[in-house]
Amino acid sequence: MKHIVKNIHFVGIGGAGMSGIAEVLLNLGYRVTGSDLGSSATTQRLATLGATIMQGHAPEHVIGANAVVVSTAVRGDNPEVLAARAKRIPIVPRAVMLAELMRLKQGIAIAGTHGKTTTTSLVASVLAEGGLDPTFVIGGRLNSAGANARLGTGDFIVAEADESDASFLNLFPVIEVITNIDADHMDTYGHDFARLKQAFIEFTQRLPFYGIAVLCVDDPNVREILPFVSKPVVRYGFAEDAQVRAVNARAVDGRMEFTVIRQLNGHAEPPLSITLNLPGLHNVQNALAAIAIATELEVPDEAIVKALAEFNGVGRRFQRYGEVPTADGKGHFTLIDDYGHHPVEMAATLAAARGAFPDRRLVLSFQPHRFTRTRDCFEDFVKVLGTVDALLLAEVYAAGEPPIIAADGRALTRALRVANKIEPVFVEQIEDMPQAILDAAQDGDVVITMGAGSIGQVPGQVVALQAQARTANVVDLNGGAAA
């Protein structure tokens, strides 16, 4: 392919799914160009690696490209897409380009409604510790690597498989993980949950006869499709029939300690005593998927244990910003950021926070993501948002969707008040959220910012705002403004 296609252009190169593929292609020696609406740390990193980054979208950006890569977020009337079509330049969906990368190595694809990014990161970390040096493409920044993608020298590529647009059906890996199946992105499946489950069944059919489907049998919907999976299966979870099973799990100082019982290939492996450097039972399940794959690939047990104990996490997945001084300067609160945006994953993250920080007030700053999701999961959002001790609620991050009546931030605020679960503070403009957090936070609080939209910038803004306030206080104490 390389002797034909040398110049590859990405429309929306700064996106999490796009940037990782672009980085791997750069490392493979392709010339990569890309456009995005604004500059970011991601686009700046790609530029330092050799990519040509252009601001905004214009027809001339595709000049010289042999292929144009787009994600489902890119509209068909984008000027670069129209120009590529007019010039007969192939327009390649992101998932198809990922599938091409997977053809170069043996693919490990992580699917599921929740937990894909963390599980992919755990798998990549364990395989790397085991000396397999995998290539990985992740939807979040792997902190230990400082990037969301890397080209390894080993035989495997580990990547997320996206069910949101059914594009995971383009992939043909040798190992698949299904973490769970939940009602999300239902527009793709005609609001028919049976069609969503059927898509996951079809995903397992992409495996070769020697492939393995690694399935979390704690999830009732995954268990339901189990009889229809015709390829070899490894079951994992807390369930008694799991072949890779966690027992005696407990939270200790923000980590999870548990024992893993493994019954694979007809014989018992030695039990593993694991300390996972992540909180929450859901992350124990994610780690079990990584342990199952590592065991199948004969990664030494000591490497598995070491990788999980030293795992440094993923950007925006229970990412800790440390202790931040309160506005009055008389105490501190713990600041955490998380990507959770579906009620199920939000509940798991909040439960993890309760386990990691027992007896502390939990303050949630939440920005709903997409009007359609807010509409479809409205009652579940009310239920999970009502479990925190204090709530700062932002307006919905539209992600390109038009507003939907009674499915916005104000509607959620009213519903929570009617339910008498909590008295939320509605923060209409996300730019005002950092100050709202500082106004609400008390000494000893745990404050979590949560959502898949622009709220990801808020924790850094909180830290910067408080640093400015402290500097101003120092200036005042010294008797005037600094010269």
Curated annotation (Swiss-Prot):
Q: Which Gene3D superfamilies does the UniProt record give?
A: Mur ligase, C-terminal domain, Mur-like, catalytic domain, NAD(P)-binding Rossmann-like Domain
Give the species this sequence originates from. Answer: Ralstonia pickettii (strain 12J)
* Gene from which the chain derives: murC
Q: What is this protein called?
A: UDP-N-acetylmuramate--L-alanine ligase
Any signal peptide, and if so, which residues? none
Record-annotated residues binding ATP?
112-118
Q: Which GO terms describe its cellular component?
A: cytoplasm
Q: In which pathway does it act?
A: Cell wall biogenesis; peptidoglycan biosynthesis
- Compartments where located: Cytoplasm
* Enzyme Commission code(s) on record: 6.3.2.8
What this protein catalyses is: UDP-N-acetyl-alpha-D-muramate + L-alanine + ATP = UDP-N-acetyl-alpha-D-muramoyl-L-alanine + ADP + phosphate + H(+)
- Family of the protein in this entry: Belongs to the MurCDEF family.
